[in-house]
Amino acid sequence: MLRLDRVEISQGTFRLTADWQVSAGEKVAMIGPSGAGQSTLLMALAGFVPYAGKVLWQGGDLGPMPPGERPLSILFQDQNLFPHLTVAQNLGLGISPRLRLGAEDHARIETTLQRVGLGGMGARKPGQLSGGQIGRAALARALLRARPILLLDEPFAALGPALKAEMLDLVAETAAETGATVLMVTHDPADARRFAGLTVLVEAGIAHAPQPTADLFANPPPALQAYLGQ
């Protein structure tokens, strides 16, 4: 279980609170106006932004853990692939920052690339990949870390509708296989409906408790109605 226990983020005049929990294996969307704090909340969970309160995973407090030791991986919108390295090397950084990789490591990398539909492409550089393939490579890097929590900060926002839907389905499929808990920031209600069983509305300084996605959009509160232009 992922528990946000009276979490409060304060940055100058910005303030965001969250006090809720989700079961392991859930797929959760976070939606709200730009600047409401969805991405900031992800950064706090990852350990990059200070916060008050506690973030608990399976009962253990993540607060004392540095970002690299937290049980999570994060995908950003820009994917953060190094252009001068091959795809395999980009993945390998998640195993060894100095790329000291053995035969077993290389086999794991290739297996993970095959899993996301990039088998045999490890020798290519990011500049030789399409937008969708870059997204798949970034997802493969996150999967290779084998962390139980996956945070998505709109990593597929720049893709067209069909390709974005394909990537969301791929994430959902791999999450189901691994049992990962996924939190996804999105500004697109269609993405939330397609991907997430639960949705968190972030507005007016509060990340509200997750609600069933279908119910939330069927009966949106005033703040969500305003965001949706209803």
Give the location of each predicted region.
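ABC-type ATPase nucleotide-binding domains, specifically the catalytic core motifs of the NBD
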Residues: 50, 65-66, 85, 89-106, ...
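Conserved beta-strand-loop-alpha-helix hinge in the C-terminal portion
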Residues: 206-229
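Conserved ABC ATPase "signature" region
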Residues: 103-121, 172-173
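Conserved ABC ATPase signature
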Residues: 125-129, 133
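ABC ATPase NBD coupling module
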Residues: 61-78, 97, 102, 216-220
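A short, proline-enriched helix->beta-strand linker immediately N-terminal to the Walker B motif
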Residues: 144-148
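Catalytic Walker B motif of ABC-type/P-loop ATPase nucleotide-binding domains
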Residues: 150-154
